[in-house]
Amino acid sequence: MKDRFKQKYTAGAAVAYMSRKQALKKLQLTLKDFRRLCIIKGIYPHEPAHKKQANKGSTANKVFYYRKDINFLAHEPIINKFRDYKVFLRKLNHLKAKKEDEKIKKLYDNKPVYNLDTIVKERFPTFGSALRDMDDALSLCFTFAMLPHTRVLKEGMIDSCRKLTAEFMHYVIESQSLRNTFISIKGIYYQAEVHGEKITWVVPHERGLPHVTDVDFTVLVTFVEFYIAMLGFVNFKLYQDIGLFYPPQIGQVVEGDEMESEEYKEKVYSLAKPLAKRKDVEQTEDDEPLDLLGEDSDALAQKVKEAKNIKTLFKGCVFYLNRECPKEALTFIIRNGGGVVGWEGAPNDLKADSKNITHHIVDRPMDKLEVNRLYVQPQWVFDCLNARRKLPTERYMPGVALPPHFSPFTSEKAGDYIPFERLEELRSMGKDVSELEAAIPKTMDELPMRRKEVKPEKPKGIHIAVGQMHKKSKEKFHETVEKGQELKMRELMISKKHQRVYHSMKTTFKRNRNDALKLKKKAKLVKATAEA
């Protein structure tokens, strides 16, 4: 009898969820501080399965959180720091109104500051979990490193982003773990393999940016604040694993004020010189033979071979970059492949007229050319990394129309449009492309051309031939009809639950096939125009 008269909204979704307004009231925080707290702690809103029940009968649109998440936030010590900061602002405004400069300076010295180290360790209990979340952290920090500082974007935050991203790039260079790269409109995509985890991030193109006014940076700044604390931990662990000093040092070990000088920082973060290693760490040989046993031995052997090719890709090559080339991107890739790179004013003092230079990277016509070096455009370096070998330089010489730059992050499937150049590239990499070539769709305008070639000329005058029965075509027709009927019967057997998914897959397949036909027709037209 007791369960029969149970009160409504005391169980289920009504108890499991809490609206944002209720959460603000429980935590006694403003909306701005609540958002910051949720971003730092990794708490996100959820959509209830029974929204009306969670809203206690109301149909109004509300943002819901798990009640257990809000109870978890209520015990967070950082909330007290938010409240202390509000008190600090109140005192600051009071002293500014009185123009008491000495007290204002003293108040700034005692400004409340919170530390995110404990929260980082709490959100990432293992090092692998932190590496899996590095994609967004690196992309956002690289973006902020390019922005000018404003009232919201503090100078210290932008400097920290530049410092941490350069440190991570130094680690990738020293460990030679860069695997793929791609130049796009958004920026340059990189992919590195760190401790078995593939980390992909995008770096904006090097260009001057004005003050951005149409973006609300208040939320992004909170993300960056957390990612800065996280990257500090990750970089320290990565540097310790391969025996590097942290913070990074060049050549010989330095101490004191020399490390804080702008000239020394410029040398460190230019990526042109190798970092100093600790003497107490044993150097491991990379060329030790591996025991490739098991079902995936072939795939593992191929992976090891590719990694070895990348590490020695530019070994023995000395590159000189012209001033119009993207220095950071090219230096990153060249040094990852074991090459030496320099430019005008580089910290390694490589001169433009040096006899040791083997490759000169230019992006504009040159008046004077040296005989003892190769001149290539910047795309050659990117394509060499993706191809795992040094490509011929004839197609990348200055003033020559560059070949297509394909993305290594896309996997080719049978039935998709695959350009002829991409097939040749895959074939040169030793991959089997027979299935891809066999599944290339035929264009509609090729069929009439074949019919015209086979079609015999009509004889002059009226001629009536004896009718013949074509058994093969009749059998083929009946076979096609039977297959179509069988397919329709199988489609009728699909449950209603999966019919929508099936039709969506069918529509997607048709759309991809039509797109492939259009692209093939366009490529054929461009080729015919170029030949004409």
From Swiss-Prot:
UniProt entry tagged with the keyword Lyase: no
Pfam families (UniProt xref): BRCT_2, Pescadillo_N
Domain BRCT: 309-398
UniProtKB keywords: Nucleus, Ribosome biogenesis, rRNA processing
CDD domains xref list: BRCT_pescadillo_like
GO biological process terms, semicolon-separated: lipid storage; maturation of 5.8S rRNA from tricistronic rRNA transcript (SSU-rRNA, 5.8S rRNA, LSU-rRNA); maturation of LSU-rRNA from tricistronic rRNA transcript (SSU-rRNA, 5.8S rRNA, LSU-rRNA)
Stored PROSITE patterns: BRCT
Keyword Transferase: no
Localization annotation: Nucleus, Nucleolus; Nucleus, Nucleoplasm
GO molecular function: ribonucleoprotein complex binding; RNA binding
Top-rank taxon, per record: Eukaryota
CC terms in the record's Gene Ontology section: nucleoplasm; PeBoW complex; preribosome, large subunit precursor
HAMAP family in UniProt: Pescadillo
Family in the record: Belongs to the pescadillo family.
PANTHER family named in the record: PESCADILLO - RELATED (PTHR12221), PESCADILLO HOMOLOG (PTHR12221:SF6)
Protein function: Required for maturation of ribosomal RNAs and formation of the large ribosomal subunit.
Name of the featured protein: Pescadillo homolog
Lineage: Eukaryota, Metazoa, Ecdysozoa, Nematoda, Chromadorea
